[in-house]
Amino acid sequence: MHCPYCRNTDTRVLDSRVADDGGSIRRRRTCSACAKRFTTVELMQLTVLKRSGASEPFTREKAVAGVRKACKGRPVTEDQLACLGQAVEDALRLDGAAEVPAHEVGLAILGPLRELDEVAYLRFASVYRAFESADDFEDEIAMLRAERPAVAIEPVTVPATEPAPPQPVATG
């Protein structure tokens, strides 16, 4: 690590702390030549392994761009898309692997998108899973319906009560 003040390569770590919920490491350093202190932040680089064999750095923006297309015309805000992108990145980082297959990125998107908007989920899933017929859509919709939490509607009973006697009005 080069000192930002004198460019000396001999620096010493004074303190290391995990930051951003484990997404980065913050290190406090000192230079042995000029004795100045500085802070560095180290991020784990996520790499996506494409089906073609090529690899590229993971970018939250690219993941959100694909979801944005599925959400077109739906009541989904940019803030919600940003939160979804963060959730996807957090899920991928939680695994701890530096290289992630593109397939895993798609799987990480499906869960949060399903909770956000079912129609957008179906649109994204139809491309991601390469739906070939209406039957594929019907199967996915049936699965969505089956996994929805059952809402139990219980009849409300109101106990019969006698009207309360009128209360005297205080004048004064």
From Swiss-Prot:
<dbReference type="InterPro" id="IPR003796">
    <property type="entry name" value="RNR_NrdR-like"/>
</dbReference>
<keyword id="KW-0804">Transcription</keyword>
<dbReference type="Pfam" id="PF03477">
    <property type="entry name" value="ATP-cone"/>
</dbReference>
<dbReference type="GO" id="GO:0003677">
    <property type="term" value="F:DNA binding"/>
</dbReference>
<dbReference type="GO" id="GO:0008270">
    <property type="term" value="F:zinc ion binding"/>
</dbReference>
<protein>
    <recommendedName>
        <fullName>Transcriptional repressor NrdR</fullName>
    </recommendedName>
</protein>
<keyword id="KW-0862">Zinc</keyword>
<keyword id="KW-0863">Zinc-finger</keyword>
<dbReference type="GO" id="GO:0005524">
    <property type="term" value="F:ATP binding"/>
</dbReference>
<comment type="similarity">
    <text>Belongs to the NrdR family.</text>
</comment>
<dbReference type="InterPro" id="IPR005144">
    <property type="entry name" value="ATP-cone_dom"/>
</dbReference>
<comment type="function">
    <text>Negatively regulates transcription of bacterial ribonucleotide reductase nrd genes and operons by binding to NrdR-boxes.</text>
</comment>
<dbReference type="Pfam" id="PF22811">
    <property type="entry name" value="Zn_ribbon_NrdR"/>
</dbReference>
<keyword id="KW-0678">Repressor</keyword>
<keyword id="KW-0805">Transcription regulation</keyword>
<dbReference type="InterPro" id="IPR055173">
    <property type="entry name" value="NrdR-like_N"/>
</dbReference>
<keyword id="KW-0238">DNA-binding</keyword>
<keyword id="KW-0067">ATP-binding</keyword>
<feature type="domain" description="ATP-cone">
    <location>
        <begin position="46"/>
        <end position="136"/>
    </location>
</feature>
<dbReference type="GO" id="GO:0045892">
    <property type="term" value="P:negative regulation of DNA-templated transcription"/>
</dbReference>
<keyword id="KW-0479">Metal-binding</keyword>
<feature type="zinc finger region">
    <location>
        <begin position="3"/>
        <end position="34"/>
    </location>
</feature>
<keyword id="KW-0547">Nucleotide-binding</keyword>
